[in-house]
C-alpha cells in the first residue's frame, strides 16, 4: 500500500525519528483505521479477539492523554480499481497455492510422494530457520530424513491467517467499541488517508497516524471552488505522521514532511511528482523506472512533463488531483477530546467483550485510565 518502495528509500536518508510518547500528551490524532484493523484482525482471523487489541491501543493512548479519532475507509476513486483487482488476483493465487500445498501434504502422508511444490515449501521453511545444520547433506538425504510435517502444517496455518477480508461486521463492531470507550470516529466517503490529511490542514488534529506513505504525497489546494467562502490559511506547521507505536518502550516513530522535503531538496509539488513516478495505488510506474531512477529524474527535471520518457502510463494529471486536498470543515467537528466513560462502563465493556470475543479484559483498569489518564499504570 502507498507509494511503491518509498518507505525503504526514505529509511536510507534517515528521516524517521523516534520520540518519547510523552511528547504527544494533550494532542489530537487521527488514525488511518484500515491499517490497524487489518493488522489486528490478521492476528485473530477466526474470532473477534482482535477487539482486545483495540482496547489495549486506546487505553495506552489515553494513558498518555492522547486523544484519537479513527477514520474509516469509504469508496475508493475509480483510478484505484486496477490496483484493487490486482490485489484480489494476488490474494487468490496465494489461496490456490496454499490449497495445493495442503493437497500435496495429504498425498505425502498417504504415499510418501514428495512433490516439487512440497519440497520447495519445506526448503523455504528451513531457510527461514535460525538453526542451520552443521554438516551439509545431499538434497535427497535432507528430503528423506528431514521433511517436517508439523512445520509444513504450521506454514499452511500461517498462510491461512491472511485469507480474510475486512467486512462491514468488523467495522460495525469496532465503531460500537469506540462509542463504548468514548472515542470519536469518522466514516469517510472516500479514502481514509485523504480525510486524515484534510483534517490536519484544517487544524483539527496535531498528528496523523498511518503506515501508508500516501499521506506524504498530498498537498493543499485551497478553498472549495465555486463558493463565496473566503479561503482560510491552512495549517502551516510541519506535517508529522506517526508511522508506529512501541508500547513496551513508550515511544513513537514519526516522519516529518518538511524534513523529507529538505533532505531530498524538493518542493511539495516536485515530491508529489516523485511519488507518482514511483507508482501509487492509482497508477503504475514506468517500466524499469523504480524509486531511485524516479528520484534522479525529478531531481534533474523538477516536473514529470520535463522528463524525457513516455510518461503516459503515469496518468499524472489525474493522480495529481487525487493527491490534492481542499480546506474542508465537514469532518472537523467530529474531532473532539475523548469522553469520560459512563458509570456502568465496567459492566458494559465486560459484557461487550464477552459477547463478541468470548473473553475478558481488565475493565476496572481501563476505567481508571480513561477517567484519570495521568495514572502511571502499565496496561497488560
Swiss-Prot record:
What coarse category fits the chief subcellular location reported for this protein? host cell
Q: Which Gene3D superfamilies match?
A: 5' to 3' exonuclease, C-terminal subdomain, 5'-nuclease
**Chain positions covered by the region annotation N-domain:** 1-101
Cofactor(s) listed? Mg(2+)
Q: What is the lineage of its organism?
A: Viruses, Varidnaviria, Bamfordvirae, Nucleocytoviricota, Megaviricetes
Pfam families named among the record's database cross-references: XPG_I, XPG_N
What name has this protein been given in UniProt?
Answer: Probable RAD2-like endonuclease 076L
What are the UniProt keywords, alphabetically?
Answer: Endonuclease, Host nucleus, Hydrolase, Magnesium, Metal-binding, Nuclease
Query: Which SMART domains does its entry note?
Result: XPGI (SM00484), XPGN (SM00485)
What family is reported?
Answer: Belongs to the XPG/RAD2 endonuclease family.
- Which note does the record give on the cofactor? Binds 2 magnesium ions per subunit.
> What does the UniProt record say this protein does?
Probable endonuclease.
- The record's EC number reads 3.1.-.-
Per its UniProt entry, what is the enzyme's top EC class, as one word? hydrolase
Where found in the cell?
A: Host nucleus
Which positions does UniProt annotate for Mg(2+) 2 binding? 212, 214, 281
GO cellular component annotations of the record = host cell nucleus
Which domain of life, per UniProt? Viruses
Q: Show the GO MF annotations.
A: 5'-flap endonuclease activity; metal ion binding
Do you know which CDD domains this protein is assigned to? Answer: H3TH_FEN1-XPG-like (cd09897)
Location of region: I-domain: 156-301
Instruction: Give residues annotated as binding Mg(2+) 1.
Output: 32, 73, 191, 193
Q: Organism, per UniProt?
A: Invertebrate iridescent virus 3
- InterPro entries, per the entry: 5-3_exonuclease_C_sf (IPR036279), PIN-like_dom_sf (IPR029060), XPG-I_dom (IPR006086), XPG/Rad2 (IPR006084), XPG_DNA_repair_N (IPR006085)
List the cysteine pairs that form cystine: none
Amino acid at each position: 500500500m502507498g507509494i511503491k518502495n518509498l518507505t525503504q528509500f526514505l529509511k536510507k536518508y534517515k528521516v524517521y525519528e523516534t520520540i518519547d510518547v510523552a511528547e504527544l500528551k494533550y494532542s489530537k490524532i487521527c488514525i488511518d483505521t484500515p491499517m490497524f484493523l487489518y493488522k489486528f484482525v490478521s492476528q485473530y482471523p477466526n474470532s473477534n479477539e482482535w477487539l482486545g487489541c483495540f482496547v489495549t491501543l486506546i487505553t495506552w493512548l489515553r494513558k498518555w492523554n492522547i486523544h484519537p479519532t479513527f477514520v474509516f475507509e469509504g469508496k475508493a476513486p475509480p483510478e484505484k480499481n486496477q490496483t484493487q483487482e490486482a490485489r484480489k488476483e494476488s490474494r487468490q493465487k496465494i489461496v490456490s497455492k496454499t490449497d495445493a500445498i495442503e493437497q500435496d501434504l495429504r498425498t505425502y502422508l498417504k504415499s510418501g510422494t514428495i512433490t516439487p511444490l512440497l519440497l520447495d515449501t519445506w526448503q523455504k521453511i528451513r531457510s527461514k530457520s535460525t538453526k542451520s545444520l552443521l554438516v551439509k547433506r545431499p538434497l535427497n538425504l535432507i528430503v528423506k530424513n528431514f521433511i517436517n510435517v508439523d512445520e509444513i502444517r504450521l506454514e499452511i496455518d500461517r498462510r491461512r491467517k491472511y485469507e480474510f477480508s475486512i467486512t462491514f461486521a468488523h467495522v460495525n463492531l469496532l465503531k460500537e467499541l469506540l462509542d463504548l470507550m468514548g472515542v470519536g470516529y469518522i466514516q469517510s466517503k472516500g479514502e481514509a488517508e485523504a480525510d486524515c490529511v484534510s483534517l490536519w490542514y484544517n487544524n483539527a488534529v496535531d498528528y496523523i497516524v498511518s503506515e501508508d506513505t500516501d499521506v506524504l504525497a498530498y498537498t493543499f489546494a485551497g478553498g472549495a471552488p465555486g463558493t463565496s467562502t473566503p479561503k482560510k490559511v491552512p495549517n502551516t506547521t510541519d506535517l508529522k505522521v506517526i508511522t508506529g507505536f512501541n508500547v513496551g518502550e513508550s515511544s513513537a516513530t514519526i516522519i516529518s514532511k518538511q524534513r523529507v522535503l529538505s533532505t531530498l531538496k524538493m518542493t511539495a509539488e516536485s515530491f508529489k511528482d516523485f511519488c507518482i513516478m514511483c507508482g501509487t495505488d492509482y497508477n503504475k510506474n514506468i517500466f524499469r523506472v523504480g524509486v531511485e531512477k524516479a528520484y534522479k529524474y525529478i531531481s534533474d527535471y523538477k516536473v514529470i512533463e520535463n522528463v524525457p520518457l513516455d510518461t503516459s502510463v503515469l496518468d499524472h494529471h489525474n493522480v495529481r488531483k487525487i493527491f490534492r486536498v481542499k480546506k474542508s470543515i465537514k469532518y472537523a467537528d467530529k474531532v473532539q477530546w475523548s469522553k469520560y466513560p459512563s458509570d456502568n462502563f465496567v459492566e458494559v465493556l465486560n459484557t461487550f467483550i464477552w459477547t463478541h470475543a468470548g473473553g475478558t479484559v481488565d475493565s476496572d483498569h481501563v476505567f481508571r485510565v480513561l477517567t484519570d489518564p495521568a495514572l502511571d499504570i502499565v496496561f497488560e
